[in-house]
């Protein structure tokens, strides 16, 4: 197991290094909106470059009245930072939202527990700034793409079950009005049945005895995350062109609907695009339509 695990890690991180090269090329082709301002902030008490977040807002608007969207980037728990989703955050701010996106440490050096700590600390840092600027903290939505979708759902579920402090020793005082799961990577039971290497990834994420890790235990599948748990209105985004999570998301949606039958779904099957297409290619026609639907979802709930 030791040699197999080490071999997996070597290949896994090499794959994501290659993704980084391609992402740099892709991001140079994107056209960013010119009516959005942003500011970068640090969180935590150290100078770790991953302990940063950014706030984006539309120019010349009354920011005290706008909905807030907190975005958690994906990258298989092992890749990326807030810059990866800067174009997506900017395009959503262009739609008259205040958007916050954070960096968090990656599993090459830490585990998922630490990543959740980073995400919570970044949100607490944002809350402090939001209070100073008189943003409307009663109108906050949470989204994440791919692995970020896992973090978004897990955070909302752990928050309702009051497990954040007992497990992580942290506090988070916020109510999310809505949850947007964008091509999410979760339900480890279903994922583990699709590829032999997923248990190796879970070990990297949660430790050698990952099945005993309290975060794994409390976020490992849809039943644990949703059964007898209050979650806000949810929007689930997938695509038949998603060759990463598409087939898994079909089974995940079936599970979700056992607990939340009224979940709203965007399934891009008419013009199928790849994994997290509305984040990666936010200028494309399909992405524009999907991101407009995200906005409509937010506004429909904001008015209630």
Identify the function of each model-found stretch.
Residues 1-304:
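Alpha/beta-hydrolase superfamily serine-hydrolase fold, recognizing
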């Amino acid at each position: 197991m030791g040699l197999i695990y080490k071999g997996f890690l070597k290949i896994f991180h090499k794959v994501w290094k290659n993704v980084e090269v391609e992402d740099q090329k892709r991001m140079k082709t994107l056209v960013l909106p010119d009516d959005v301002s942003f500011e970068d902030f640090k969180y935590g008490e150290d100078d770790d470059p991953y302990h940063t977040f950014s706030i984006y807002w539309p120019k010349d608007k009354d920011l005290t009245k706008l909905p807030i969207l907190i975005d958690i980037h994906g990258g298989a728990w092992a890749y990326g930072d807030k810059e990866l989703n800067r174009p997506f955050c900017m395009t959503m701010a262009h739609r008259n939202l205040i958007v916050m996106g954070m960096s968090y440490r990656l599993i090459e050096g830490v585990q998922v527990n630490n990543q959740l700590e980073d995400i919570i600390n970044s949100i607490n840092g944002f809350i402090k700034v939001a209070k100073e600027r008189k943003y409307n903290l009663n109108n906050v939505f949470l989204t994440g793409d791919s692995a970020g979708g896992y973090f978004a759902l897990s955070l909302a579920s752990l928050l309702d079950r009051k497990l954040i402090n007992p497990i992580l020793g942290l506090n988070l005082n916020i109510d999310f009005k809505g949850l947007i799961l964008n091509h999410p990577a979760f339900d480890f039971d279903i994922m583990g049945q699709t590829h032999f290497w997923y248990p190796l990834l879970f070990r990297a994420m949660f430790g050698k005895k990952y099945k005993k890790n309290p975060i794994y235990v409390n976020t490992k599948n849809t039943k644990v995350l949703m059964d007898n748990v209050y979650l806000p209105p949810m929007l689930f985004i997938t695509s038949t062109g998603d060759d990463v999570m598409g087939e898994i998301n079909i089974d995940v949606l079936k599970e979700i609907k056992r607990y939340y039958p009224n979940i709203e779904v965007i399934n891009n099957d008419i013009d199928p695009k790849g994994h997290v297409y509305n984040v990666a290619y936010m200028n494309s026609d399909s992405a524009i339509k999907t991101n407009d639907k995200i906005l409509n979802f937010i506004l429909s709930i904001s008015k209630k």
